[in-house]
C-alpha cells in the first residue's frame, strides 16, 4: 500500500512539473535567423538560407547589432 501511495505521489509531481518545463524550453528557443547590420542572416546553419528560412523583413529576424 505504501508503495502505491509513493508511486502515485511521484506520478502526480512529474505531471505537475512536465508542461511548465516544456513551455519554458519553447520560450527560450532562438529564432533561426538574426538581423546583422539590417540584413536577415541564418543563425548557425548556412542551409537555412537555401530553404528560405530568412525572407527579407521576416519576423524571424532579431536585431543583434545595436543602432547608434
UniProtKB/Swiss-Prot annotation:
Q: Which residues form the signal peptide?
A: 1-24
Q: Which InterPro entries match?
A: DEFBL_dom (IPR049528), Myo_ane_neurotoxin_sf (IPR023355)
- Cystine bridges: 33-60, 40-54, 47-61
Localization, per the record, is: Secreted
Keyword Calcium applies: no
What's any GO biological process attached to this entry?
Answer: defense response to bacterium
GO CC, alphabetical: extracellular region
The keyword Disulfide bond appears for this protein: yes
Q: Using the UniProt record, give the first listed, main subcellular location.
A: secreted
Q: Which domain of life is it from?
A: Eukaryota
Q: Which UniProt keywords apply?
A: Antibiotic, Antimicrobial, Defensin, Disulfide bond, Secreted, Signal
Which tissues does the record link to its expression?
Answer: Highly expressed in intestine, liver and spleen and expressed at lower levels in brain, kidney, lung, testis and venom gland.
Write out the domain note: The 4 N-terminal Arg residues do not affect the overall fold, but are important for the antimicrobial potency.
| Job of this protein | Potent antimicrobial peptide that displays activity against S.aureus and P.aeruginosa. Does not inhibit growth of E.coli.
Q: What is the official name of this protein in its record? A: Venom-like beta-defensin
Amino acid at each position: 500500500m505504501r508503495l502505491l501511495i509513493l508511486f502515485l505521489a511521484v506520478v502526480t509531481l512529474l505531471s505537475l512539473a512536465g508542461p511548465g518545463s516544456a513551455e519554458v524550453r519553447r520560450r527560450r528557443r532562438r529564432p533561426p535567423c538574426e538581423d546583422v547590420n539590417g540584413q536577415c542572416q541564418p543563425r548557425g546553419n548556412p542551409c537555412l538560407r537555401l530553404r528560405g528560412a530568412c525572407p527579407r523583413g521576416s519576423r524571424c529576424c532579431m536585431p543583434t547589432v545595436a543602432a547608434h
